[in-house]
UniProtKB/Swiss-Prot annotation:
Pfam families: Ribosomal_L6
Listed GO MF terms: rRNA binding; structural constituent of ribosome
Family: Belongs to the universal ribosomal protein uL6 family.
One Gene Ontology cellular component annotation held by this UniProt entry: cytosolic large ribosomal subunit
Gene3D superfamilies per record: Ribosomal protein L6, alpha-beta domain
Key words, A-Z: Ribonucleoprotein, Ribosomal protein, RNA-binding, rRNA-binding
Function: This protein binds to the 23S rRNA, and is important in its secondary structure. It is located near the subunit interface in the base of the L7/L12 stalk, and near the tRNA binding site of the peptidyltransferase center.
Source taxon at top rank: Bacteria
UniProt-recorded name of the protein: Large ribosomal subunit protein uL6
Example of a GO biological process term: cytoplasmic translation
Entry-linked InterPro entries: Ribosomal_uL6-like, Ribosomal_uL6-like_a/b-dom_sf, Ribosomal_uL6_a/b-dom, Ribosomal_uL6_bac-type
Length: 187
């Protein structure tokens, strides 16, 4: 039995969960609404403020989907109550981010600035640098964990951190393994 799949999901006050035909789960909360179609092989029940997930059989695929389904529902409940965020750090001489309306303008060493338009349900926040040596932070917020992570990965992919000076865009919690530069010529 899946250890994660067995755990019941408590539904906090102010969150409304509906399970429609075909395992279409709708979660409404203070921050918004999320709708997700989940695998039909799972049995999802909502009783007494608790959601439980069970599987039809003990097949390998059903065992794999059991924990996944439970995690997806738990992420939806967390998303509509607390929301999700990823923090990116921009490091480099002349590298900066500016918010223009909803859009994000990045100057990260290309000959032109890069304009990033957020998808539906995602917001960007740009923190100003406190000192010249500190990296600039961009916060990506939203209620859908997958969209927040995907948008953060797309921004990081524009200029991944390089190992020699550490310039580029990285996640706040990411550690960049630094390399030594060229060794001097021996005489």
């Amino acid at each position: 039995m899946s250890r994660i799949g067995k755990k019941p999901i408590p539904v906090p006050r102010g969150v409304e969960v509906t399970i429609a035909e075909g395992n279409v789960v709708t979660v409404k909360g203070p921050k918004g609404t999320l709708i997700q179609r989940l695998p039909p092989e799972m049995i999802i029940t909502h009783e007494n403020g608790v959601i439980t997930v069970a599987r039809l059989s003990d097949q390998k695929q059903h065992r794999a989907l059991h924990g996944l389904t439970r995690s997806l529902i738990a992420n939806m409940v967390t998303g509509v109550t607390e929301g999700y965020q990823r923090v990116l750090e921009i490091t480099g001489i002349g590298y900066r981010a500016v918010r223009e309306g909803k859009n994000l303008i990045l100057q990260v060493g290309f000959s032109h600035p890069i304009r990033v338009t957020p998808p539906e349900g995602i917001t960007f926040e740009v923190m100003e640098r406190r000192s010249a040596n500190e990296p600039q932070q961009v916060i990506i917020r939203g209620i859908d964990k997958q969209k927040v992570g995907e948008e953060a990965a797309k921004l990081r992919a524009l200029r991944p951190p390089e190992p020699y000076k550490g310039y580029g865009i990285k996640y706040r919690e990411e550690r960049v393994r630094r390399k030594a530069g060229k060794a001097g010529k021996a005489r």
